[in-house]
């Protein structure tokens, strides 16, 4: 599927095509081609009509170290974005941006919610968008705003998790570990994504294809992403502190359990000794002939069990 955004007088118009067949818009009017789950035929047409090369091997694009490169006619960018699925699970998705003749081509598979936000802004404020570089700049701005929202969510979840651990609320240890691990992974993914955007923007600032006004906006966005990277570092430290706090709490609980079993063992040793004595097969044991000998032995066992417990409590070991 192809979404095309083009200028028409003072407005930006969006048209949707199933492929490039029937496409009748003048090239100088087009701002943005958005290709969603493109077929090989669509990519071949794109390459033929607009002299754009796109690597169709997804695994090579993902594993490629080069996220930005340009030649005499175009700029190509591979960037990662956080995305939320139906189960409210965050993960990273990659999108490719190609800028050629001031037209932006975006190619991605699946669903990226950031592009829905971009479309609304482009259609609502057409005067702000004169070429593909303006749209790309706005994509970075919107992603910065999304990043701020994600970091605020992490901060909130981190605070709740800390309270859960300190006040020993209903969550089990397994639940706490899962939540902590998810927050750490999401924060690291955001951090990598922000680093990714900083590298891309820095490369764009060096390009002679970008005009001065766009570079001024990119400089501001670059500073914004640097602040987000610092925030992710703070979050990492907070999550590490929570992990240490949780580990300390688990150690304390384990020590209590060990202490309890130690006390129980010590408390049972005297009555066991007493029972062992009366289990000896000596011929002369007066208590065996005594009418209340059995009751006497039970009382002595009970007293010998209680006395160590009282002693341990006075010592503060229980």
Swiss-Prot record:
InterPro entries: CorA_cytoplasmic_dom, CorA_MIT, CorA_TM1_TM2, Mg/Co-transport_prot_CorA, MgTranspt_CorA/ZnTranspt_ZntB. Gene3D superfamilies: CorA soluble domain-like, Magnesium transport protein CorA, transmembrane region. SUPFAM superfamilies: CorA soluble domain-like (SSF143865), Magnesium transport protein CorA, transmembrane region (SSF144083). A motif (Probable selectivity filter) lies at residues 279-281. This is Magnesium transport protein CorA. GO terms for molecular function: cobalt ion transmembrane transporter activity; magnesium ion transmembrane transporter activity; nickel cation transmembrane transporter activity. GO terms for cellular component: plasma membrane. It comes from Helicobacter pylori (strain J99 / ATCC 700824). Mediates influx of magnesium ions. Alternates between open and closed states. Activated by low cytoplasmic Mg(2+) levels. Inactive when cytoplasmic Mg(2+) levels are high. It is a multi-pass membrane protein. It catalyses: Mg(2+)(in) = Mg(2+)(out).
């Amino acid at each position: 599927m192809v979404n095309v955004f083009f200028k028409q007088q003072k407005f930006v118009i969006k048209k949707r095509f199933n492929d490039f067949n029937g496409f009748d818009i003048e090239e100088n009017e087009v701002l943005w081609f958005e290709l969603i789950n493109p077929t090989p035929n669509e990519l071949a047409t794109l390459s033929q009509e607009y002299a754009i090369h796109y690597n169709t091997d997804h695994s090579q694009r993902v594993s490629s170290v080069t996220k930005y490169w340009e030649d005499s006619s175009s700029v190509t960018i591979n960037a990662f974005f956080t995305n939320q699925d139906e189960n409210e699970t965050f993960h990273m998705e990659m999108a490719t941006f190609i800028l050629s003749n001031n037209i932006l081509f975006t190619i991605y598979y699946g669903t990226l919610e950031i592009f829905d936000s971009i479309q609304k802004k482009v259609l609502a404020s057409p005067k702000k968008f004169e070429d593909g570089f303006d749209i790309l700049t706005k994509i970075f701005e919107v992603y910065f705003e999304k990043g701020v929202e994600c970091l605020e969510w992490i901060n909130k979840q981190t605070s709740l998790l800390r309270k859960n651990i300190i006040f020993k609320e209903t969550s089990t240890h397994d639940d706490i570990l899962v939540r902590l691990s998810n927050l750490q992974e999401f924060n690291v993914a955001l951090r990598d994504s922000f680093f990714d955007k900083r590298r891309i923007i820095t490369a764009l600032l060096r390009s002679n294809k970008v005009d001065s006004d766009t570079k001024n906006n990119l400089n501001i966005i670059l500073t914004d992403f640097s602040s987000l990277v610092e925030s992710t570092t703070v979050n990492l430290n907070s999550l590490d502190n929570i992990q240490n706090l949780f580990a300390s709490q688990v150690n304390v609980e384990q020590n209590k359990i060990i202490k309890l079993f130690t006390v129980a063992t010590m408390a049972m040793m005297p009555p066991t000794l007493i029972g062992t004595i009366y289990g000896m097969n000596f011929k002369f044991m007066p208590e065996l002939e005594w009418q209340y000998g059995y009751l006497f032995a039970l009382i002595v066992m009970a007293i010998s069990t209680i006395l160590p417990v009282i002693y341990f409590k006075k010592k503060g070991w229980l």
